[in-house]
C-alpha cells in the first residue's frame, strides 16, 4: 500500500504506477473547495478508472466540517466520491489539533469550544469529533452525519473487501495478455489475490447490506469461477466456515462487545542525561589514597604498577 496525491499520481501513466507494484493507493478527495494544492492534476474520474483497470485499488479520504460545507454540500460531495467507486473510503471530521495554525486561528476567533479549550481530551483528536463552532452544524450533528455517511457508503458500494477483490480481478483480466513482462506478472499476482479471497465472498452473499449488494457478491464469484476455474473443496469449506464467523462479528458489533481494546498505558522513567562535567568532578574528588602506588597492583586491570623512569 502506498500514498499518492492527485498531483503526484498525475505525473505518471497508469501503466507506470502499476509497474511500481502498488496494489492499494491512498489518495485524498477531501472536499471540492478545500483548495489543497495536492488535489490539482488529472480529473478524478479519469485517474480512478485508469488505475482500477490496472488492478490498483484506491482508498479515498473525505473531510466534513469545512466552513463552506452545509448538509446539502456534504451530500453533493458524498455522491461525487461514491460515483468514483473507491475500494476503501474514510470520512473524517475537520479538527484543529493544538499547535497547528488552524488551532491558533480558532482560538483567536473565539470559536474553539470551551470544553476542549479549557481541558482538552486528546483522545478525541482522531477525526471523529469537532472541537470548534461551525456555521451549519453542532458538534453532535456533525458526528451523527459522519455515521450516516459511513452507513450509506456501505449500502451503496457494499463491503470494502469485495470492492478491493473486484478491482484486483479487473486488473487480472485487463493485464493477463499484456506484452509487458511486469504487467503480465502483475496479472498473475492479482489472480492469486483473488483466488485467496474467495472464502470472504460467501458471507457477503448472505449478509450483505441489501439485495443489490448480495447480488453483486454472487456475480463476482460467478465471474471469478468462469475466468479462473472451479472452486476447490478446500476453498468451498473455508467459504462456508466464514459465514458463522462473520455472523459472530456482526453480533458483537451490534452489541458493542469485544470491539476496540482498552488503552494500555505504560510509563518508563526517563534515562538521566549524560553529564561529562559531573563525571570529571567525581574523578577529581577521588582520594589520593585510592590511586595505586608504585609496586602495587592496579585494582582495575590487575597489572603491576611501576615507578616512572627519568
Q: What name fits each language-model region?
A:
Residues 120-123, 127-310:
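Radical SAM enzyme core and accessory elements
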Residues 2-4, 61, 93-94, 132, ...:
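Long, contiguous hydrophobic alpha-helical segments, chiefly transmembrane helices and signal peptides
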Residues 1-66, 74, 88:
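Conserved SAM/AdoMet-binding glycine-rich loop
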Residues 64-72, 85-139, 162-177:
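Flexible glycine/acidic-rich beta-alpha junction loops that bind and position SAM and/or redox cofactors
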Residues 17, 81, 99, 149:
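Conserved, mostly hydrophobic/aromatic
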Residues 44, 77-79, 107-110:
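Short, hinge-like loop/turn segments at secondary-structure boundaries
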Residues 13, 47, 77, 145-149, ...:
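Alpha-helical packing segments of well-folded alpha/beta enzyme cores
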